[in-house]
Structures are given as C-alpha cells and as structure tokens.
Amino acid sequence: MVEEGVRVVRCGGSRLNFRRAVFSVDSKYIFCVSGDFVKVYSTTTEECVHILHGHTDLVSGILVNPSNHLQLYSCSFDGTIKLWDYVDGILIKTFTIGPKLHAFFIPLHAEDSVFLTISKEEPDIFQLVSVKLPKSTSQDVEARQLTFVLDYINRSPKCIAFGNEGEYVAAVRDFYLSVYFFKKKKTCNFTLPSTKNKKNAKNKFTCVACHPKEDCIASGHMDGKIRLWRNFHSDQKYTYTCLHWHHDMVMDLAFTVTGTSLLSGGRECVLVEWRDGSEKNKEFLPRLGSSIEHISVSPAGDLFCTSHSDNKITVIHRNLDASAVIQGLVKDRSISTGLMVDPRTKALVLNGKPGHLQFYSLQGDKQLYNLDIIQQEYINDEGLTQTELTKAAFGCSGTWLATVEQRQENENELELQMKLWNYSKKTQGFVLNTKIAMPHDDHITALCFNNAESYEKPILVTASRDGHFKVWILTDDSDIYKKAIAWTCDFVGSYHKYQATNCCFSEDGSLLAVSFEEIVTIWDSQTWELKCTFCQRAGKIRHLCFGRLTCSKYLLGTTDNGILCCWNLLSCSIQWSAKLNVRVMEPDPYSDHVAAVAQSSAGSDLFVFKPSEPRPLYIQKNVSREEVQWGVFVPRDVPESFTSETHQWLNRSQFYFLTKSQSLLTFSTKSPEEKLTPTSKQLLAEESLPTTPFSFILGKHRQQQGAKLTETSENELVQLPLTENIPAITELLHTPAHVLPSASFLCSLFVNSLLLSKETKSAEEVPDDVDMEGNKESDDSDEEYDLTEKDKETNNNTDLGEDAIHQLSKSEEKELRKFRKVDYSWLTAL
C-alpha cells in the first residue's frame, strides 16, 4: 500500500471557552472556537456536525454573516478572516488583513465593514479598527486598508460592545469607559475612582454590554457590581445606577434580543437574569458547575448559552432551564494523575473537575462522564486549601481503580487517603470498596497494579517519599462471614532509607522494579525478596518501565541528568545508554515499541525504539513547540496495516500526548475530517438531527416502500435500479443549490443517471396499473398465441443462430409501444 507521511494533528482538548459561542439564526447550531478550528454543534443532540479547519493559528472570533445566514466569519491570530459555508463545512473565501487579530465585530448596518482589535507596536496596547471586505470572485482577497476607531482598549472582546443598532461603540479598560459615536465622530470618556483604599480598589472594569434598542450601557466590575450608564452623550451629564448580587468579579454581561433583561455571570456558577434593570426583579439559574466566563444569546432570543472555566458550554432555554451541555476536555491546574486508558471503554482518563476523574472519548472528542473521587462539595475560594487528586491507576482489565488524594495546608500537616474502587456490572460504574487513611507517612510518588493474567488475585504497589514501598492485596476476611472483600497491606519494603520514586511490574508479573532515588531495585513478586540492584549514578530516576514481548528481558530508565539507560535483566548489566533529556516515556502494551519524548531547545522531539536496539526506528523533530508533559498509547479499534518498519509502531496503537498548555495531540496520516466528502458530511448532519414527527412518518414510509420493493423483486425478472444508490442523484439532492454548477451542466449527468445500462435486461411481464385494466382482454386473448410464438422462436433459434436473437416477441413489442406513448417534451425545457 502507498503510505502517507505521519504528521502531528490536534485531536481535541482545545479550549471551547476561549471566546463567546455563537448561535445560528434558526438556533439549530452553535459555533465555538477550538484552537485553530471552529466547531459546529447541534443544540439538541450536542453532537459535533462539522469541524472547520483552515487557520494556522488560534481562532480569536466568530460571527454569522449578516448578509447570508448560512455563512460564518472567523478571524484568527494568523491575520486572516475566513468566510465559511457551515452547512457543508466548506471554506468560501479568505481575507488577508495582516496584523494579529484579537477580536471581531460586525454591528448592524455596517455595509460590508467589520471591526477588529489589533495590537500596536507597543506591548499591551491595542486598537479598534475597521476594514471593508471587498467583494471579489477570487477565493483569496487582500484587505489591508485599516481605519482607526479607538485607541488604548482591552484586547478581550468582552470589553467592547456596539449599541443601539450600531450607533456607538463602548470600550472599557482598567478604570476607564470610552464611547465613540459614529455619526458625530466624537468620543466621550468616563473614569471611576482608582485610589488605593479598599472601597475603590475594585472599581476596575471587567466587561461591557450595550442595550440593542436604547442608549444604555451595562458594565461589570471587579467588586461584583453592575453599573447601568445613561445620558453618556456628554462627559458631564452622565448617570449610572448599580446592581449588586455577585460577591466576586462579574465575568460577562449580555442583553437579551429585546433588551428587557440583562444576563450576568461570575465565579458563583450562577446565571443571573436582571429584568427591566431592577435589582428587585431577578431570576437565577444556580449550580452550573463552574465559573461562567462568557454569555451568548441566540438571534431568535429563545436560547442562551454560557461558557465555563471547565471547558464546558451549557445551552439554556429562555425559561432558564438547561437543555444541553457540550463538554470538552477539562483543563485542570495540573494533570498529576497523568494520562490513562480505561480498559473497558478505551476512553482517556485524567484529572478533570477538582476532585474528579474525567473519562474522555477520543473518537468523539467529548467527555463521557465524571467520577467523583473526593466526594466533597467544591468551594470556589482562592484562599482555601483544596483536597487534590494526585494519583490514579487501573488494574485487572478495568475491574479495579486505585486513587490517591491529599490535602496539605503546611509542611507538617498532610492529609492522605487512598481509595480502591471496584467496577460494578450492575450499576455500570465504579463503587468505592476500600478507603485507607494515611497509607504512607509522606507523599505517594507512584502506584501500579500487577496486571499479569497468571495472577488470580490483584496486587497493588505504592511508593512514597517516606522511603517505603507497600504491597496491597485483596482479602476476603473483612468480616466474620467472609462475604466481603477489602484491601490490606501484605508487605513493606525499603532500601537504605532512600525515597522511593517509581515502581512497575514486568509483563508476566514475576518481577517488581522500584527506584530509590539513583538506584533501581528488582524484587521477586512471589517472595518479595530483593534480587538485584542497578546503580547508574547519573541522577535520580525519573521514569521506569519494562520491555514487552520480545524485549521483556530489558528494563528502561531515565534520569534527571538527561540519561536514558537500558539494563539486561539476564546478565544484570547495562545494555546501552544514551544522552537524552526524556520528559515522557511510554511502552506500547500491544507491541515491543517504546515512545520517548525529549525536550530540546527548539521544542519536543519524539523517538520510537525497541529496547533491544539502541538505534531509534522513528524520529520526528519538533512535534510541539512547548513542553510535552504526558503521553499514552491507546489501542486502535481497527488495526492499521503499515508495512514500513518506521510506521509499524502505529499499527495496533495510537500515541497521544498532552502539552503544557493542555493541548491533546497525536500522530496520524490523515485527519478524520479530510476523509469526509461534502455530501457525506451533510448526511452525517442529517443523521444527527432530532427525530421529528414528520421524519418518523417518512421513515415508516421508506420502510414500507423498501419492503414492497423487496417483495416485488422476488417476482420480477429484473429489478430497476433505485435512485438512492445513484451517486449523481444523491449529490444533486444533498448539495445546497447555491454551490451547485449550472443546470445545463447537470442536465446530461442527471438524465444519464436515470437511464438503464445496456447490460440491464428489460422486464417482460410487469404491466402498469393502467395497462392492467385497459389491455386485460388483449392479454387473455394473446396468452395462447404468445406460448405458441415462444415455442416457434425456440425452434428457430436452433436453426438461425445469432440472427434470431434480434427478433422481438409479441410481449416485447407491446412494451415498446408503451414507451412510444411517453411524453419526453419536458427535456426540451432544460
């Protein structure tokens, strides 16, 4: 087979909450930025319908085209504005602006002009400019003529708003509010007190929103207050009123379409609706899960949506009832558990919300569910010391899950708990089995299960800074009836009071390797006797893993000083070593390959090798500009068939890695979106739409029609081809009219697709309904004659040979007479 080059692709994990989400005009779709992609979701099914990719840097703004509601604009840090057909996921046009674009606005009555936030030459200084997008038939258009509007603004789009149908624009930064009137070409500036006393220290502006119909500006502040500004046409006569409910900073504001209500959100995880600008008349939607960062309103006014700090988008009905949740990969402060794979669901498992493990589908790029480990109510307070989930590991094909949580207010007060969870087939989830308080006297640095199939009972090993590693086994004597099972400590090991840093089992489970700072110890898992030690004196051991399959006799280790070592367990000596600053080392559980990601001055480099050979099989430089923190091999549902030795490591597993900014990347030959044609994307979109009464009736009709066709085909000599299976007709019916070629070009293709091929035999005895009534007597009278004619034709065919094949029977002549009566004059109209 012809193999394509392996390249790094973003497979998910990008921030969905980087900018405000945008609704389509009919509220069927919601658009959100996701790294350098734009994702199109269904508001009812929560499924991703399309992924719009074409930008080379982060997408910083999206808006529906006011001139064509089936099109979407997007701007990016790459300095371009792209116009999309979001129904089919097609890029229509690219406008090259030049500078880095931070925000994007299209007010009413803009007349092909858009407003952009760009950076000046000075750091942290931004401008609001306008640019006219020229009308051109070319797909790549340059629009570099920028018109200055406002200076010294905040780059966040939440700090700029257009009001009263685009008559003015309001911008806030620090303690200043600026209002620019387009007709008057005048700017009014307003300032709040900014003294250092406690009363005025939190007057700083955080966001702004403008009333769609009236001259009213709403601003949010650090102290949780909302100010409604009026009479701001003059610097002296302005007034404002205060609304106060939030105890912390107001994160975002949004007016409804009619302007009768104002929506606000903050760190309280509560959406507040202020009706008629009154503090007494407000409604709440509480317990949204995490801080609200953005608020959006649909053009029809029937839906709201909130973007949250845990990379989640919540779709809300007008009556403040949450209807859908689009959950991305949760961005935790630190991924201390690393990347794991659930053996049952093949989902990616890592830290999620505080105190939770998230199970994330790599195929669907969405969260499956959260597992609450700490089981405590989370209090959003920066000064409060939270209980953190630090370690986790799966064992026994996903039957057991071990987690470690800790809380430490100071160096001398450490709260440590280890929990063992058992998978319940009845509840289809993990149930807490054993909770162990203070399993070690210091922080737990590593834990691992013995997953060898030869061992009937599971074994868990934990390593700690207290200088010990402990072996935990499952016992059934936790009560007098011996019906309950629980985990208990079976063995405690140490080595010269060094801190234990890593631990891992061999593939067959017979050996346990535990690293104590710079020394690696090998233990017999049956008797827990120390077999041998390896001392490389090249720094503390950072990673430790055994080889697999043909390389099971090797042990790999990396050090803090940038040394990669390979030891031979049979000869108890070092096999080879290399100078490599390895940050991530992961063995493939389904092959003998090992992936190592090393940090260099230019970025992160990938090395794939076998422990038996010091020469790497595959090297790819600069897989990421930033540091790679975690990696994991995920088994494929359908194995690949790469024949090249450099690509065989991708056959059974796929390597995923997580960067410092928590972007999830992988290696592939082709992205999933590139494998889809526009027609198949449209079909996918239709399949993701909800089942309506009409579609239910239509589906039953199609099933009945298909059953009739099946019954008819059993009695017919030949079945006519169905139009659903003809590519030309499918393409014509499912492609939007505005992207189709001219009718004259499609006519010949469409008509030819309806014609029968030469190889298809004509049906002999399938009369029409009309013909059954009109020619009933004729068929009866000619039945005997047809049989006689067929006998004669059979005898003549024997004598005449091929010449007899071209003679027509009586029934065939009748079929031809039917076709002569058909009116084909409609073809001339095309």
Curated annotation (Swiss-Prot):
Keywords: Isopeptide bond, Nucleus, Phosphoprotein, Repeat, Ribosome biogenesis, rRNA processing, Transcription, Transcription regulation, Ubl conjugation, WD repeat. It is found in: Nucleus, Nucleolus. GO terms for molecular function: RNA binding. The modification Phosphoserine is found at residues 663, 671, 778, 781, 811. The modification Phosphotyrosine is found at residue 785. GO terms for cellular component: nucleolus; small-subunit processome. WD repeats lie at residues 4-42, 46-85, 89-130, 144-183, 192-230, 236-275, 278-317, 323-361, 375-422, 429-473, 486-524, 528-568, 573-610. SMART domains: WD40. There is a cross-link at residues 426, 675 (Glycyl lysine isopeptide (Lys-Gly) (interchain with G-Cter in SUMO2)). Residues 761-807 are annotated as: Disordered. Pfam families: Beta-prop_WDR75_1st (PF23869), Beta-prop_WDR75_2nd (PF23769). It comes from the Eukaryota. GO terms for biological process: positive regulation of rRNA processing; positive regulation of transcription by RNA polymerase I; ribosomal small subunit biogenesis; rRNA processing. Ribosome biogenesis factor. Part of the small subunit (SSU) processome, first precursor of the small eukaryotic ribosomal subunit. During the assembly of the SSU processome in the nucleolus, many ribosome biogenesis factors, an RNA chaperone and ribosomal proteins associate with the nascent pre-rRNA and work in concert to generate RNA folding, modifications, rearrangements and cleavage as well as targeted degradation of pre-ribosomal RNA by the RNA exosome. Involved in nucleolar processing of pre-18S ribosomal RNA. Required for optimal pre-ribosomal RNA transcription by RNA polymerase I. Component of the proposed t-UTP subcomplex of the ribosomal small subunit (SSU) processome. SSU processome is composed of more than 70 proteins and the RNA chaperone small nucleolar RNA (snoRNA) U3. PANTHER family: WD REPEAT-CONTAINING PROTEIN 75. This is WD repeat-containing protein 75. It comes from Mus musculus (Mouse).
